[in-house]
Amino acid sequence: MSAAIAEARAQGLVGERFDGYLAIVGDAGDQLRHQVQAINIRRRALYSDLADRRGASLEQVGMTAACQLLPTVHVGERYQASDKVWRTRSAGQELLVPDYCR
């Protein structure tokens, strides 16, 4: 992950989604949007390859990846659970992960 994306995550401008992709949270410049799009294109290509090899759907692979990506969200960073509500991770607060991650 680039330093710009890491900084944007720390500022709450970019967050991890429940489906394995990054998203812009609120207002962001074009450069940041392009970086998020590029990461999501790479993730989608990886998920597609894994889905083909495993005989799974793209969505299933993305959701499985989310189960690994969501725990990487640090305190102060944003994430979206399967209810599609954006949350900010707080110190001492349990991360709300989708049921399929348990």
Please provide the spans of the model-predicted regions.
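Amphipathic, charged alpha-helical segments and their helix-to-coil junctions
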Residues: 1-11, 15-16, 23-25, 58-102
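Surface-exposed, polar/charged faces of alpha-helical domains
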Residues: 27-34, 38-41, 45, 49-56, ...
